[in-house]
Each structure stands twice: as structure tokens, then as C-alpha cells.
UniProtKB/Swiss-Prot annotation:
Keywords: Cytoplasm, Protein biosynthesis. Pfam families: RRF (PF01765). This is Ribosome-recycling factor. One of its GO terms (cellular component) is cytosol. It comes from Pseudomonas syringae pv. tomato (strain ATCC BAA-871 / DC3000).
Length: 185
């Protein structure tokens, strides 16, 4: 029972870390990478569809993305969706494909993106702490139901705390790495 609680907490904490890593891919650095456009939704036959399902996004060079729509008549809709996405991109329509040049990050935008990264990291830390709280609550319930002793509960609580400390440290490493990527000129 104790092992199940610890395993569940570890799995959920790992998912929080993965969620943070995924959130970091949406924050752009100075380099071009297709995942920057991952959140762009394109109107396709009346429904908003992810860009990846209506077009192929590739890296042309370190500062340029190339977008090729699967259907040529969708190119204008893809262009408009990218412009209105709030990412600050203005695609160049070449008839068969779109080119998106990544503007250089100013000091102000770097600081804004760094703040976004820190906010995402704080959300992940809060999620990990909430998972710890849930696990400790489950352990206390087991003691209350006399399924485990208080000593076992204390040992398991220490293990859960060590797990929490490990994941909080991993989050810290991830945010420091993202900040370094953002501040690199």
C-alpha cells in the first residue's frame, strides 16, 4: 500500500516535470524550432485544427521556419492563423510555402520570456507540492485506519519528501537551463 502511494506520487511528479518541459517548448528562444508553432490553430472546414495537422513545419536555417500546407488552398488560412497567434511572426507567402523569419530577441522580450519560464516553473513546483500533500494525506488515512504504524508512516513521509526535493531540484535545473538559453545572444 505504501509503495503504491509512493509510486503514484512519483508518476504524477514526473508528469508535472514533463508538462513543464512541454511548456518550455512554447517559449521561444533565439533559435527556430517547429514546436514554437505548436499552439497555432487553423480554421479548417469550420473547425479549429492544430497547425501540425494541416501543414508541415520544418527548420530552413537557424532563424527561419518553412511551412508547407498539405492543401495549397489552405496557405492563406495558415498565414492568417500564424499572424493572429500572438507570437509576433509575420510569414512571407511564397505561393507554395510560407517562410517565417525569427526576429532577434530584444532584452525586453528576453526578460518577458524568462518571466514566463519562471511562472511555468513555479506552477510545476506548486503541482509537485500538491502531489506531496495528497500522498501524505493518504498515508495519514492509512495510520488512522490502522493499516500501517506511525513509524512506517514517518518513513514513507520521509521518502515522499525526498522525492519532492528531487523533483523540485529537477524543475530548478530545467528553469535555469531555459533562462540560460533565453539570455544567450
Amino acid at each position: 500500500m505504501i509503495n503504491e502511494i509512493k509510486k503514484d506520487a512519483q508518476t504524477r511528479m514526473q508528469k508535472s516535470l514533463e508538462s513543464l518541459t512541454h511548456a518550455f517548448t512554447r517559449i521561444r528562444t533565439g533559435k527556430a524550432h517547429p514546436s514554437i508553432l505548436g499552439g497555432v490553430m487553423v480554421p479548417y472546414y469550420g473547425a479549429d485544427t492544430p497547425l501540425s495537422q494541416v501543414a508541415n513545419v520544418t527548420v530552413k536555417d537557424s532563424r527561419t521556419l518553412q511551412v508547407v500546407a498539405f492543401e495549397r488552398n489552405m496557405l492563406a488560412a495558415v498565414d492568417k492563423a500564424i499572424q493572429s497567434s500572438g507570437l509576433g511572426f509575420n510569414p512571407t507567402n511564397l505561393g507554395e510555402l510560407l517562410l517565417i523569419s525569427m526576429p532577434a530577441l530584444t532584452e525586453e522580450t528576453r526578460k518577458g520570456f524568462t518571466k514566463q519560464a519562471r511562472d511555468a516553473a513555479e506552477d510545476a513546483r506548486v503541482a509537485v507540492r500538491n502531489i506531496r500533500r495528497d500522498a501524505l494525506s493518504q498515508l495519514k488515512d492509512l495510520v488512522k485506519d490502522k493499516e500501517i504504524s506511525e513509524d512506517e508512516e514517518r518513513r514513507a513521509a520521509d521518502d515522499v519528501q525526498k522525492l519532492t526535493d528531487k523533483f523540485v531540484a529537477d524543475i530548478e535545473v530545467a528553469v535555469k537551463q531555459k533562462e540560460a538559453d533565453l539570455m544567450a545572444v
